[in-house]
């Protein structure tokens, strides 16, 4: 009660400044949307993206920031953690559930062989996994109402961001070629069958 949710996105103007995309974001619940656009925001690395997000978030003001675990392009899983570091606030990744308290949040994250429960004070940054919820499709009322919600646009200069020289430049992003399934079926439980099975693992 009394809380407000601001969606924040950064990127090249040609990509982020999209009325249809803004409306889609706002139809899913946020009270308003802030876009930070600049022609130099192309091919940014996590260190740069987190810097822009941190400066914009600091200007907006916040108690709790939610980030995805990773982006669709690089999935480096670094941006949210770097953002928390630059803002000087606690940051937890891999979060699968959240319970809010008075000035604190209790979160759970799944590790290899256990579920870890952590309590952190606000303000904070949380990087959530896909297990956090199952997004619902927005209703027609929400879609129509999204067009009336405010959208703020800032430039890099508005948040005091200067695009410095990159120490590392990503020239390409490659994915391993998907291997074809061999459909090898081994029946039996003899030593030879087990050895043959092991060879195909």
How should these model regions be labeled?
Residues 1-201:
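N-terminal glycine-rich FAD/FM-binding segment characteristic of electron-transfer flavoproteins
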